Regions:
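Active-site cleft segment of glycoside hydrolase catalytic domains centered on the general acid/base Glu
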Residues: 1-31
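Hydrophobic, Leu/Ile/Phe/Ala-enriched alpha-helical segments that form helix-helix packing faces
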Residues: 20-24, 45, 106
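Short beta-strand scaffold positions
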Residues: 35-37, 150
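C-terminal active-site rim and adjoining tail of enzyme catalytic domains
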Residues: 4-11, 47-160
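Short active-site oxyanion
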Residues: 28-33, 144-147
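Short, conserved alpha-helical segments within structured domains
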Residues: 13, 37-38
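Short, well-ordered alpha-helical microsegments
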Residues: 39-43, 156-157
Length: 160
Protein backbone atom coordinates (compact mmCIF):
# COMPACT_ATOMS: atom_id res chain seq x y z
CA UNK A 1 0.00 0.00 0.00
CA UNK A 2 1.72 3.15 -1.24
CA UNK A 3 0.02 5.50 1.22
CA UNK A 4 0.97 3.34 4.22
CA UNK A 5 4.57 2.88 3.07
CA UNK A 6 4.93 6.62 2.51
CA UNK A 7 3.41 7.73 5.82
CA UNK A 8 4.68 4.99 8.15
CA UNK A 9 7.93 3.83 6.57
CA UNK A 10 9.07 6.92 4.69
CA UNK A 11 9.26 5.10 1.34
CA UNK A 12 8.36 6.96 -1.84
CA UNK A 13 6.65 4.18 -3.77
CA UNK A 14 4.94 6.63 -6.14
CA UNK A 15 8.26 8.20 -7.05
CA UNK A 16 9.78 4.77 -7.62
CA UNK A 17 6.93 3.78 -9.94
CA UNK A 18 7.18 7.05 -11.87
CA UNK A 19 10.96 6.65 -12.21
CA UNK A 20 10.61 3.04 -13.37
CA UNK A 21 8.03 4.01 -16.00
CA UNK A 22 10.23 6.85 -17.20
CA UNK A 23 13.44 4.81 -17.37
CA UNK A 24 11.62 2.07 -19.30
CA UNK A 25 10.27 4.80 -21.60
CA UNK A 26 6.74 3.58 -20.96
CA UNK A 27 5.57 7.01 -19.89
CA UNK A 28 5.66 8.43 -23.42
CA UNK A 29 5.24 5.57 -25.89
CA UNK A 30 2.67 3.31 -24.25
CA UNK A 31 -0.71 3.86 -22.71
CA UNK A 32 -0.11 3.57 -18.97
CA UNK A 33 -2.80 2.56 -16.49
CA UNK A 34 -2.29 3.39 -12.82
CA UNK A 35 -4.68 1.50 -10.55
CA UNK A 36 -5.27 2.10 -6.86
CA UNK A 37 -8.04 1.95 -4.30
CA UNK A 38 -6.55 5.09 -2.75
CA UNK A 39 -7.71 8.34 -4.37
CA UNK A 40 -4.71 10.27 -3.02
CA UNK A 41 -2.40 7.98 -4.99
CA UNK A 42 -4.39 8.59 -8.18
CA UNK A 43 -4.41 12.31 -7.52
CA UNK A 44 -0.60 12.38 -7.27
CA UNK A 45 -0.24 10.53 -10.56
CA UNK A 46 -2.65 12.96 -12.21
CA UNK A 47 -0.48 15.85 -11.09
CA UNK A 48 2.76 14.23 -12.27
CA UNK A 49 1.60 12.87 -15.61
CA UNK A 50 -1.92 13.67 -16.82
CA UNK A 51 -1.57 11.20 -19.71
CA UNK A 52 -1.66 8.20 -17.36
CA UNK A 53 -5.07 6.59 -17.26
CA UNK A 54 -6.07 6.46 -13.60
CA UNK A 55 -8.20 3.50 -12.50
CA UNK A 56 -10.03 3.44 -9.17
CA UNK A 57 -10.19 -0.10 -7.79
CA UNK A 58 -13.32 -1.35 -6.05
CA UNK A 59 -12.42 -4.66 -4.43
CA UNK A 60 -15.94 -5.20 -3.08
CA UNK A 61 -19.14 -5.30 -5.13
CA UNK A 62 -21.07 -2.11 -5.78
CA UNK A 63 -24.70 -2.25 -6.81
CA UNK A 64 -25.31 1.31 -7.90
CA UNK A 65 -23.43 4.43 -8.94
CA UNK A 66 -25.45 7.53 -8.03
CA UNK A 67 -24.44 10.88 -9.51
CA UNK A 68 -22.71 12.25 -6.37
CA UNK A 69 -20.53 9.12 -6.21
CA UNK A 70 -19.72 9.33 -9.92
CA UNK A 71 -18.86 13.03 -9.60
CA UNK A 72 -16.44 12.14 -6.81
CA UNK A 73 -14.87 9.32 -8.84
CA UNK A 74 -14.31 11.70 -11.78
CA UNK A 75 -12.16 13.94 -9.58
CA UNK A 76 -9.58 11.18 -9.25
CA UNK A 77 -10.04 8.55 -11.95
CA UNK A 78 -10.73 8.05 -15.64
CA UNK A 79 -11.89 4.47 -15.12
CA UNK A 80 -12.97 1.97 -12.51
CA UNK A 81 -12.08 -1.67 -11.97
CA UNK A 82 -15.05 -3.43 -10.40
CA UNK A 83 -15.60 -7.06 -9.48
CA UNK A 84 -17.93 -9.27 -11.51
CA UNK A 85 -20.61 -9.21 -8.80
CA UNK A 86 -20.99 -5.47 -9.38
CA UNK A 87 -22.37 -6.23 -12.83
CA UNK A 88 -24.04 -9.60 -12.30
CA UNK A 89 -24.88 -10.14 -8.62
CA UNK A 90 -24.75 -13.68 -7.27
CA UNK A 91 -26.91 -15.63 -4.89
CA UNK A 92 -25.33 -18.44 -2.87
CA UNK A 93 -25.39 -20.74 -5.89
CA UNK A 94 -26.09 -18.84 -9.11
CA UNK A 95 -25.73 -15.45 -10.70
CA UNK A 96 -29.01 -13.57 -10.70
CA UNK A 97 -30.74 -12.79 -13.96
CA UNK A 98 -30.92 -9.10 -13.14
CA UNK A 99 -27.84 -7.13 -14.01
CA UNK A 100 -27.03 -3.82 -12.37
CA UNK A 101 -26.93 -0.45 -14.09
CA UNK A 102 -23.39 0.31 -12.91
CA UNK A 103 -21.76 0.03 -16.35
CA UNK A 104 -24.40 2.28 -17.96
CA UNK A 105 -24.15 4.80 -15.13
CA UNK A 106 -20.37 4.98 -15.38
CA UNK A 107 -20.41 5.20 -19.18
CA UNK A 108 -22.98 8.01 -19.05
CA UNK A 109 -20.37 9.97 -17.09
CA UNK A 110 -17.58 9.02 -19.52
CA UNK A 111 -15.88 6.68 -17.03
CA UNK A 112 -14.42 3.48 -18.50
CA UNK A 113 -15.34 0.23 -16.75
CA UNK A 114 -13.03 -2.75 -16.35
CA UNK A 115 -14.16 -5.90 -14.60
CA UNK A 116 -11.98 -8.33 -12.67
CA UNK A 117 -12.35 -11.63 -10.89
CA UNK A 118 -12.29 -14.04 -13.81
CA UNK A 119 -11.05 -17.49 -12.89
CA UNK A 120 -11.91 -20.86 -14.37
CA UNK A 121 -11.93 -22.40 -10.91
CA UNK A 122 -15.02 -20.71 -9.49
CA UNK A 123 -18.22 -22.69 -9.00
CA UNK A 124 -20.56 -19.99 -10.30
CA UNK A 125 -18.69 -19.84 -13.61
CA UNK A 126 -19.16 -23.55 -14.04
CA UNK A 127 -22.88 -23.52 -13.27
CA UNK A 128 -23.94 -20.31 -14.93
CA UNK A 129 -21.65 -20.39 -17.92
CA UNK A 130 -21.70 -24.11 -18.71
CA UNK A 131 -18.10 -24.52 -17.49
CA UNK A 132 -16.99 -22.42 -20.45
CA UNK A 133 -14.78 -19.39 -19.69
CA UNK A 134 -15.50 -17.98 -23.16
CA UNK A 135 -19.23 -17.81 -22.43
CA UNK A 136 -18.41 -15.99 -19.20
CA UNK A 137 -16.22 -13.44 -21.02
CA UNK A 138 -18.84 -12.96 -23.73
CA UNK A 139 -21.53 -12.37 -21.10
CA UNK A 140 -19.60 -9.57 -19.44
CA UNK A 141 -18.45 -8.01 -22.69
CA UNK A 142 -22.11 -7.99 -23.77
CA UNK A 143 -22.82 -5.88 -20.68
CA UNK A 144 -20.61 -3.18 -22.23
CA UNK A 145 -17.44 -3.34 -20.15
CA UNK A 146 -14.38 -1.70 -21.65
CA UNK A 147 -12.06 -4.51 -20.66
CA UNK A 148 -11.55 -7.55 -18.47
CA UNK A 149 -8.81 -8.36 -15.99
CA UNK A 150 -8.33 -12.09 -15.64
CA UNK A 151 -6.25 -14.66 -13.81
CA UNK A 152 -6.16 -16.56 -17.10
CA UNK A 153 -4.57 -14.36 -19.78
CA UNK A 154 -4.19 -17.33 -22.11
CA UNK A 155 -7.96 -17.87 -22.11
CA UNK A 156 -8.60 -14.18 -22.73
CA UNK A 157 -6.03 -13.97 -25.53
CA UNK A 158 -7.50 -17.05 -27.23
CA UNK A 159 -10.91 -15.43 -26.95
CA UNK A 160 -9.67 -12.26 -28.66
Amino acid sequence: NAAYLASKKGLDILGSVKDALKSAKLDSKQRVFIQSDDTSVLEKFKASNPTYKRVLLFSKPISDAPKPVIDNIKKYADAVNIVKKSIMPETKIYITNRGTQVVKQMHAANISVYVSGFSTETLSMQLDFYSDPYIELISFIAEGVDGVITDNPKTASQFM
